[in-house]
Design a protein with these regions (language model features):
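Residue-level detection of the helix-turn-helix DNA-binding "recognition helix"
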Residues: 39, 50, 79
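Short, charged recognition helix plus adjacent turn
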Residues: 75-102
C-alpha cells in the first residue's frame, strides 16, 4: 500500500461514493428501484451511498450481478478503502511490530 506510487496522496474512495457520484446518476432508475432489484431495503442502499455501511461480500455479489462487473470490483474497492483509511490510524502500532526475518 504505502509502496504504491499511484495511490500516494489520493484520498481513499468508499464504494458508496462511487455509486452516489458516478454510477447511479448515469442510470435512468430511481434508488427505490435499484434497491428492489438488488433485493435490499432502501435504507441499506442509502447507508452504503452515505458511506455508513461497507460493501460486504454478499452486497458485492449483488452489485456485481446488477452491474455485470462481478463482485471482485466492489470487494477490492472496499478493501482498498478500509486499508487506506485504517493504516494511518494504526501507524504507531504497526511501527512497533517487529517483522520475522526472511
Amino acid at each position: 500500500m504505502a509502496g504504491n506510487p499511484l495511490s500516494r496522496g489520493l484520498a481513499p474512495t468508499h464504494p458508496g461514493e462511487l455509486l452516489r457520484k458516478d454510477v447511479i446518476p448515469a442510470l435512468d432508475l430511481p434508488k427505490t428501484e435499484i434497491a428492489r432489484r438488488l433485493g435490499i431495503s432502501r435504507q441499506t442502499l442509502y447507508d452504503i451511498l452515505d458511506e455508513k455501511q461497507p460493501v460486504t461480500p454478499a452486497m458485492a455479489l449483488r452489485l456485481g450481478k446488477f452491474f455485470g462487473n462481478g463482485p471482485d470490483f466492489w470487494l477490492n474497492l472496499q478493501r482498498d478503502y478500509d486499508l487506506r483509511t485504517l493504516e494511518p490510524k494504526m501507524a504507531e502500532e504497526l511501527a512497533a511490530i517487529e517483522p520475522v526475518a526472511a
